[in-house]
Design a protein with these regions (language model features):
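Active-site rim beta-loop-alpha module in soluble metabolic enzymes
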Residues: 147
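Short, structured patches in soluble enzyme cores that scaffold and shape functional sites
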Residues: 150-152, 178
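Short conserved active-site loop signatures built around small residues
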Residues: 155
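Short helices/loops that flank or line small-molecule/ion binding pockets
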Residues: 161-165, 169
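Acyl-CoA/ACP chain-elongation machinery
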Residues: 170-181
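Conserved "HGTGT" condensation-loop signature of ketosynthase/thiolase-family condensing enzymes
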Residues: 1-144, 164
Length: 181
């Protein structure tokens, strides 16, 4: 018989906000959260969330080299991990991104075109495995870390993969999600 699986924490960062109460209050306002940016309609994340990202970057020198997708994933993971007390030993992490470290890739490409050199951080900070490994490291978890990319459904695949690992008894808990920047 399959054992029951429960979602015990949830977090998001969007134009609605970051803190659960703020997200709900903004949602109930029924206002549009789109604005024009460089001629395109966008839905930017909240100023509160931008400030949280800036504070995160200040915490560790290594964080300044990370892609925005990784920083967003770390912030969301922290919100989930701090609301729980993980007693289990085998905790996996599966956070994916359909676009990955696009911001850094574009920056490194521009740098190469201008200087004909690329930063030594280009490869390690744009590798797909970067998201889950940084989330696990930040949370102090040492279980399996998995990344993948599935257009438009990466977070759902992370959830399903986490369930599969739990049902197979290869992990006691799983931190799952998707990150796009």
């Amino acid at each position: 018989m399959l054992k029951p699986i429960s979602i015990t924490a949830i977090s998001s960062i969007s134009a609605l906000g970051h803190a659960p109460a703020t997200v709900w209050e903004t949602y109930l306002e029924k206002t549009r959260l789109f604005s024009k940016m460089e001629g395109d309609w966008v839905s930017k994340i909240s100023a509160e969330s931008e400030q949280a990202i800036a504070q995160l970057i200040q915490e560790k020198t290594a964080y300044k080299n990370l892609d925005r997708t990784v920083l967003l994933a770390i912030l969301n993971a922290r919100a989930c991990v701090t609301s729980l007390k993980f007693q289990q030993k085998r905790i996996g992490v599966n956070v994916g991104s359909s676009r990955g470290a696009t911001g850094l890739i574009e920056g490194y490409h521009k740098q190469f075109l201008e200087r004909e050199k690329v930063s030594p951080f280009a490869s390690p900070t744009t590798t797909m495995g970067n998201i889950s490994s940084w989330v696990a490291q930040d949370a102090g978890l040492d279980g399996v870390t998995i990344d993948h990319s599935v257009t438009c459904s990466t977070a759902m695949h992370s959830l399903l993969n986490g369930i599969a690992w739990l049902q197979a008894d290869m992990a006691d808990a799983f931190l799952v999600g998707g990150s796009e920047a």
